[in-house]
C-alpha cells in the first residue's frame, strides 16, 4: 500500500511539473505573437504615413475606406 501511495504521489508531481512547463510555453508563445502583431501594426502605420506624405490624396482615401468599413 505504501509503494502505491509513493507511486501515485510521484505521478501527481510529474503531472504538475508537465502542466506547469506547458503553461509557461503557451504564455511565451502568446507574448511572441503580441510582439509580432505590434511590430506589424507599427510598420503599417509607417507605410501609411509615408504614402500620405508622398501622395496628396492618399490620406483622404484611407479615411473614407476606414470610416466605411468600421460603420458598415
Swiss-Prot record:
Residues bearing Phenylalanine amide?
A: 71
Q: In which tissues is it expressed?
A: Expressed by the skin glands.
Question: What keyword terms does UniProt attach to this protein?
Answer: Amidation, Amphibian defense peptide, Antibiotic, Antimicrobial, Cleavage on pair of basic residues, Disulfide bond, Secreted, Signal
Subcellular localization(s) per the UniProt record: Secreted
- Please give the name of this protein: Galensin
- Family recorded in the similarity comment: Belongs to the frog skin active peptide (FSAP) family. Brevinin subfamily.
Q: How does it assemble?
A: Homodimer; disulfide-linked.
Origin organism is Kassina senegalensis
Which GO terms of the cellular component aspect does the record hold? extracellular region
Propeptide residue numbers?
23-48
InterPro entries per record: Frog_antimicrobial_propeptide
Phylogenetic placement of the source organism: Eukaryota, Metazoa, Chordata, Craniata, Vertebrata
Q: What does this protein do?
A: Antibacterial activity against the Gram-positive bacterium M.luteus and the Gram-negative bacterium E.coli.
One GO biological process this protein is involved in is: defense response to bacterium
Point out the signal peptide segment.
1-22
UniProt-listed Pfam families: FSAP_sig_propep
